């Protein structure tokens, strides 16, 4: 098969979590012998911020880490869709693309494109910003891949797409796995108690970070570290006052080695996900569990039963968060049991290979054929 992906960026994951899962999907397709071409805008804001924050050498590093990535950076006014889509069998268009490009690809498909065309939505805007999402012209698309049942239902209820399927994110377990601590970046940090990898959140979880991370860490006097971007000066001062080391942006593919240097991590979802998107944990949960680190999560509604009780610990209040942190640090054997259980669920149900299998089944269903025949196109 020839797969074509249009996305915001795979070269940069600066404040851009969609890159994590999509890199894993591309890698898995390639491991199965399929050709994958990726198109991203030359002026992608994630790339521009990465260059400003870490320099051009980070783009080179991404290519070294993912040597098989075939990424073309295009200018919107000169993109030749006939050339880009020539010979395509499956085309995925992520929702972080312009309304104009989404429509142009749909029109290309309507003019006789023989590929399967799917729109991929991994954001809360279909529930929280209906006006923006309703502006996408998906009339010529074969369907929508939604990263949660609530998103799928939203598309069907509003008539935005012909069909929609729930297609959750997952972990790239070739990259995200338990590993020894490394000093690749010239660092030699002692093993810490807790690490949080995540961005401040544009006021979507500022209070939650104060209540469920900064407060408990300060009261327990933990050796803690935070990686992420868009932390205002006030937030950095609060972290410092709590004794938390703020370490800035971390390339996503380095997360496993950072997890390996710490005894536990936490998940603090953004407010819109908890309030309006039940069943969607976001990519960080999958990746942390894949790395075999004990996880304490703020409560979120796992209404789709993605995980088993005990795969991670749940804290409904700041006091519960503090207690769960203390329990894991006090009882290493129990912490190891939690970590093993969480990783086992990822390996059994939530890898990028599982999602590629699901995507191939969806494609076969649309074509009225078997997966085997899809693969021989």
Regions found by a protein language model. Name each.
Residues 18-29, 211-212, 359:
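Short amphipathic alpha-helix
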